[in-house]
From Swiss-Prot:
Similarity field: Belongs to the bacterial ribosomal protein bL35 family.
Cellular component annotations (GO), alphabetically ordered: cytosolic large ribosomal subunit
InterPro entries reported in the protein's UniProt record: Ribosomal_bL35 (IPR001706), Ribosomal_bL35-like (IPR021137), Ribosomal_bL35_CS (IPR018265), Ribosomal_bL35_sf (IPR037229)
NCBIfam families according to UniProt: rpmI_bact
Protein's name according to its UniProt entry: Large ribosomal subunit protein bL35
Superkingdom per UniProt: Bacteria
MF-aspect GO terms: structural constituent of ribosome
One GO term (biological process): translation
Native organism: Novosphingobium aromaticivorans (strain ATCC 700278 / DSM 12444 / CCUG 56034 / CIP 105152 / NBRC 16084 / F199)
């Protein structure tokens, strides 16, 4: 049986934590930030953990894990 391929978009956008949770970067930080206040920009910095339901789908698209 051939190897399963990982979705390239998943490789680029998600990381797996040691406990098995899936992290992703917060959306809406590329351009047009002048219209947002400093609190919005600060709070959307970094990454967040996605929900369990979404994580299940992401893990299916990455059959050998995300490194």
């Amino acid at each position: 049986m051939p190897k399963l391929k990982t979705k390239s978009g998943v490789k680029k956008r998600f990381k797996l934590t040691a406990s098995g949770k899936v992290k992703h970067g917060v959306a809406g930080k590329r351009h047009r930030l002048i219209s947002h206040n400093a609190k919005y920009i600060r709070q959307n910095r970094g990454t967040e953990v996605i929900s369990d339901a979404d994580a299940k789908v992401i893990k299916k698209w990455a059959p050998y894990g995300l490194n």
